[in-house]
């Protein structure tokens, strides 16, 4: 085997053994020693927790107000029916949620294939039993909400957020979105030419039928690669720029009225009214200033002209005035 001792072997997909439509074994080799467990454990965790899928989240059954009740003519109690509904393997194309209906009457089993749905919905286990009707006069009708999601979301996590809007009789269901039912991996010895210290990774996986096992492996590997992309070139990691804080007020408003270079008469009148800063002045109205002793229309006109030359005017509204720096003074 040629190549530098520092080079890593690049594994290849050796074999995909399709045990059944929902069960497959995927073999990957050769791997450097230890990488079998490194990759196997990472892929296993992603396959179990991060594969998106669809699950039943809410159910409404005619004549049923809560999950701790029973329904006449139905062998199972409501809790058992909800548990059976969790076992539905549903695939939805192009939608994040759908409402399915189920209406059945007459003695016999009620199965997933009895559910009414459109072409965007596929039920992978139509023979899955939901409940049993005990006599010819028994009937059951329900509306089933199916949502797309990821991982496991217990019903208790949605109770408080939906409590005000949820009508009586709408039953929440623990949602297991992952289409992967079981995943295990093993690491065996592999050999390439004279090297016998290599790993062979065998991933044994079962799905609920809504996702092909081979496709599941590809998706998990893609997720892992995308998460590691940030480490490939750390120079691409952008350091957030520190935003320059904008002053709360225009600096000119913080300057003393003396900077306006008013006549002595006008300046003294303003100081007598405790108007020390330009920000204090612009908040006054013409009427208020005319009430100031010894300040007439001539002085008012002067003040207005000086303010206008600086893009200011009387009667302005300043939120949070005065600023802390002035208030402390």
Swiss-Prot record:
Q: Which reaction(s) does the protein catalyse, per the Swiss-Prot or TrEMBL entry?
A: RNA(n) + a ribonucleoside 5'-triphosphate = RNA(n+1) + diphosphate
Keywords linked to the UniProt accession: DNA-directed RNA polymerase, Nucleotidyltransferase, Transcription, Transferase
Q: Tell me where on the tree of life, at the top rank, the source sits.
A: Bacteria
| Alpha C-terminal domain (alpha-CTD): annotated span | 249-329
**What is any one GO biological process for this UniProt entry?**
DNA-templated transcription
GO MF, any single term: DNA binding
Which parts of the sequence are annotated with region: Alpha N-terminal domain (alpha-NTD)?
Answer: 1-235
Q: Is Transferase given among the entry's keywords?
A: yes
In terms of SUPFAM superfamilies, this protein maps to:
C-terminal domain of RNA polymerase alpha subunit, Insert subdomain of RNA polymerase alpha subunit, RBP11-like subunits of RNA polymerase
Instruction: Give start-end of the signal peptide.
Output: none
Q: Which cysteines are joined by disulfide bonds?
A: none
Q: What is its EC number?
A: 2.7.7.6
Q: Which GO terms describe its cellular component?
A: cytoplasm; DNA-directed RNA polymerase complex
Q: State the CDD domains in the record.
A: RNAP_alpha_NTD (cd06928)
What is the enzyme's class at the highest EC level?
A: transferase
* Family per similarity comment: Belongs to the RNA polymerase alpha chain family.
Free-text note regarding domains: The N-terminal domain is essential for RNAP assembly and basal transcription, whereas the C-terminal domain is involved in interaction with transcriptional regulators and with upstream promoter elements.
Q: How does it assemble?
A: Homodimer. The RNAP catalytic core consists of 2 alpha, 1 beta, 1 beta' and 1 omega subunit. When a sigma factor is associated with the core the holoenzyme is formed, which can initiate transcription.
Q: What does this protein do?
A: DNA-dependent RNA polymerase catalyzes the transcription of DNA into RNA using the four ribonucleoside triphosphates as substrates.
Put simply, this protein is called: DNA-directed RNA polymerase subunit alpha
What is the native source organism of this protein?
A: Photobacterium profundum (strain SS9)
């Amino acid at each position: 085997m040629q190549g530098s001792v520092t080079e890593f072997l690049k594994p290849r997909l050796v074999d995909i053994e399709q045990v059944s439509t929902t069960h497959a074994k995927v073999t990957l080799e050769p791997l450097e020693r230890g990488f079998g467990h490194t990759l196997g454990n990472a892929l296993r965790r992603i396959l179990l927790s991060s594969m998106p899928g669809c699950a039943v989240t809410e159910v409404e059954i005619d004549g049923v107000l809560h999950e701790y009740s029973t329904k006449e003519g139905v062998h199972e109690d409501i809790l058992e029916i909800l548990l059976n509904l969790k076992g539905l393997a549903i695939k939805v194309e192009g939608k994040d949620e759908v409402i399915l209906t189920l209406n059945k009457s007459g003695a016999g089993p009620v199965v997933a294939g009895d559910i009414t749905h459109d072409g965007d919905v596929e039920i992978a286990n139509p023979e899955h039993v939901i409940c049993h009707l005990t006599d010819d006069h028994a009937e059951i009708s329900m509306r089933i909400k199916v949502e797309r999601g990821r991982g496991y979301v217990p019903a208790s996590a949605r109770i408080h957020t939906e409590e005000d809007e949820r009508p009586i009789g709408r039953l929440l269901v623990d949602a297991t979105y992952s289409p992967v039912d079981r995943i295990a991996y093993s690491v065996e010895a592999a050999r390439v030419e004279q090297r016998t210290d290599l790993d062979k990774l065998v991933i044994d996986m079962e799905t609920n039928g809504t996702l092909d096992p081979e496709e599941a492996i590809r998706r998990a590997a893609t997720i892992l690669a995308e998460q590691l992309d940030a480490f490939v070139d750390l120079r691409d990691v952008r350091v957030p720029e520190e935003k320059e804080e904008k002053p709360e007020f225009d600096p000119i408003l913080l300057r003393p009225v003396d900077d306006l270079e008013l006549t002595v008469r006008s300046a003294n009148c303003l100081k007598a009214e405790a108007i020390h800063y330009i920000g204090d002045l612009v908040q006054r109205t013409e009427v208020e200033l005319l009430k100031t002793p010894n300040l007439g229309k001539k002085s008012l006109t002067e003040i207005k002209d000086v303010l206008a030359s600086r893009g200011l005017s009387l009667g302005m509204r300043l939120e949070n005035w005065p600023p802390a720096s002035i208030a402390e003074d």
